[in-house]
UniProtKB/Swiss-Prot annotation:
Pfam families, A to Z: CRCB
GO CC, any one term: plasma membrane
Domain of life: Bacteria
Protein name per UniProt: Fluoride-specific ion channel FluC
Protein task: Fluoride-specific ion channel. Important for reducing fluoride concentration in the cell, thus reducing its toxicity.
Natural source organism: Helicobacter pylori (strain J99 / ATCC 700824)
InterPro entries: FluC
GO BP term (any one): cellular detoxification of fluoride
Record key words, sorted: Cell inner membrane, Cell membrane, Ion channel, Ion transport, Membrane, Metal-binding, Sodium, Transmembrane, Transmembrane helix, Transport
Membrane topology annotation: Multi-pass membrane protein
GO molecular function, one term: fluoride channel activity
Cellular compartment(s): Cell inner membrane
Protein backbone atom coordinates (compact mmCIF):
# COMPACT_ATOMS: atom_id res chain seq x y z
CA UNK A 1 0.00 0.00 0.00
CA UNK A 2 1.26 3.47 -0.86
CA UNK A 3 1.63 5.52 2.33
CA UNK A 4 2.11 8.88 0.58
CA UNK A 5 -1.46 9.98 1.30
CA UNK A 6 -1.22 8.84 4.91
CA UNK A 7 2.00 10.81 5.43
CA UNK A 8 0.48 13.94 3.87
CA UNK A 9 -2.72 13.59 5.92
CA UNK A 10 -0.87 13.00 9.18
CA UNK A 11 1.38 16.00 8.55
CA UNK A 12 -1.63 18.10 7.57
CA UNK A 13 -3.39 17.27 10.82
CA UNK A 14 -0.33 18.33 12.80
CA UNK A 15 0.14 21.52 10.78
CA UNK A 16 -3.52 22.50 11.06
CA UNK A 17 -3.46 21.95 14.81
CA UNK A 18 -0.35 24.10 15.13
CA UNK A 19 -1.96 26.83 13.01
CA UNK A 20 -5.04 26.84 15.24
CA UNK A 21 -2.87 27.02 18.38
CA UNK A 22 -0.74 29.91 17.09
CA UNK A 23 -3.85 31.77 15.92
CA UNK A 24 -5.46 31.51 19.34
CA UNK A 25 -2.32 32.73 21.12
CA UNK A 26 -2.08 35.98 19.13
CA UNK A 27 -3.86 39.19 20.16
CA UNK A 28 -6.17 40.96 17.70
CA UNK A 29 -4.75 44.39 18.61
CA UNK A 30 -1.33 44.88 17.02
CA UNK A 31 0.79 48.02 16.94
CA UNK A 32 -1.52 50.86 15.91
CA UNK A 33 -4.27 48.59 14.57
CA UNK A 34 -7.42 47.72 16.48
CA UNK A 35 -8.07 44.66 14.34
CA UNK A 36 -5.20 42.85 12.63
CA UNK A 37 -5.04 39.14 11.69
CA UNK A 38 -1.78 38.64 13.58
CA UNK A 39 -2.27 34.88 13.97
CA UNK A 40 -2.49 34.28 10.22
CA UNK A 41 0.25 36.85 9.60
CA UNK A 42 2.59 35.08 12.05
CA UNK A 43 1.83 31.61 10.73
CA UNK A 44 2.51 32.69 7.15
CA UNK A 45 5.87 34.24 8.06
CA UNK A 46 6.94 31.26 10.18
CA UNK A 47 5.85 28.90 7.40
CA UNK A 48 7.76 30.89 4.78
CA UNK A 49 10.93 30.72 6.86
CA UNK A 50 10.58 26.98 7.47
CA UNK A 51 9.78 26.18 3.84
CA UNK A 52 12.86 28.15 2.76
CA UNK A 53 15.01 26.17 5.16
CA UNK A 54 13.47 22.80 4.29
CA UNK A 55 13.37 23.63 0.58
CA UNK A 56 17.12 23.94 0.49
CA UNK A 57 17.57 20.67 2.37
CA UNK A 58 15.10 18.91 0.04
CA UNK A 59 16.90 20.25 -3.03
CA UNK A 60 20.13 18.76 -1.67
CA UNK A 61 18.40 15.41 -0.96
CA UNK A 62 19.14 15.58 2.78
CA UNK A 63 15.96 13.64 3.56
CA UNK A 64 13.83 11.13 1.71
CA UNK A 65 10.66 11.72 -0.27
CA UNK A 66 8.40 10.33 2.47
CA UNK A 67 9.67 12.86 5.01
CA UNK A 68 9.38 15.66 2.45
CA UNK A 69 5.76 14.72 1.78
CA UNK A 70 5.02 14.45 5.50
CA UNK A 71 6.70 17.69 6.53
CA UNK A 72 6.62 20.06 3.55
CA UNK A 73 3.34 18.99 1.93
CA UNK A 74 1.60 17.88 5.11
CA UNK A 75 2.79 19.89 8.10
CA UNK A 76 3.61 23.11 6.25
CA UNK A 77 0.60 22.73 3.94
CA UNK A 78 -1.65 22.46 6.99
CA UNK A 79 0.21 25.17 8.89
CA UNK A 80 0.48 27.97 6.33
CA UNK A 81 -2.74 29.72 5.55
CA UNK A 82 -2.74 31.72 2.37
CA UNK A 83 -6.40 30.89 1.82
CA UNK A 84 -7.14 32.34 5.25
CA UNK A 85 -4.90 35.26 4.29
CA UNK A 86 -7.19 36.09 1.37
CA UNK A 87 -10.29 35.84 3.52
CA UNK A 88 -8.79 37.97 6.29
CA UNK A 89 -7.82 40.63 3.75
CA UNK A 90 -11.30 40.65 2.26
CA UNK A 91 -12.86 41.04 5.70
CA UNK A 92 -10.62 44.02 6.45
CA UNK A 93 -11.60 45.62 3.14
CA UNK A 94 -15.28 44.94 3.77
CA UNK A 95 -14.96 46.76 7.11
CA UNK A 96 -13.24 49.69 5.31
CA UNK A 97 -10.02 49.03 7.24
CA UNK A 98 -7.88 49.90 4.25
CA UNK A 99 -4.65 50.70 6.06
CA UNK A 100 -4.79 47.38 7.92
CA UNK A 101 -5.52 45.52 4.67
CA UNK A 102 -2.64 47.16 2.79
CA UNK A 103 -0.24 46.64 5.71
CA UNK A 104 -1.29 43.01 5.97
CA UNK A 105 -0.84 42.26 2.26
CA UNK A 106 2.48 44.10 1.90
CA UNK A 107 3.85 42.83 5.22
CA UNK A 108 2.94 39.21 4.53
CA UNK A 109 4.44 39.21 1.05
CA UNK A 110 7.61 41.20 1.72
CA UNK A 111 8.43 39.63 5.07
CA UNK A 112 7.44 36.19 3.76
CA UNK A 113 9.94 36.45 0.93
CA UNK A 114 12.60 37.62 3.37
CA UNK A 115 11.75 34.66 5.64
CA UNK A 116 12.19 32.18 2.76
CA UNK A 117 15.54 33.76 1.82
CA UNK A 118 16.84 33.71 5.41
CA UNK A 119 15.74 30.10 5.90
CA UNK A 120 17.47 29.06 2.67
CA UNK A 121 20.63 30.97 3.63
CA UNK A 122 20.77 29.40 7.11
CA UNK A 123 20.26 25.89 5.78
CA UNK A 124 22.91 26.44 3.13
CA UNK A 125 25.52 28.07 5.36
CA UNK A 126 25.02 26.71 8.87
CA UNK A 127 23.71 23.18 8.46
CA UNK A 128 26.64 22.33 6.22
CA UNK A 129 24.59 21.36 3.19
CA UNK A 130 26.02 23.15 0.16
Amino acid sequence: MNLVFLWAALGGAIGSSLRYFVGKMMPSKFLMFESFPLGTFSVNLIGCFIIGFMGHLAAKKVFGDDFGIFFVTGVLGGFTTFSSYGLDTLKLLQKSQYLEAISYVLGTNLLGLIGVAIGWFLAKNFVGVN
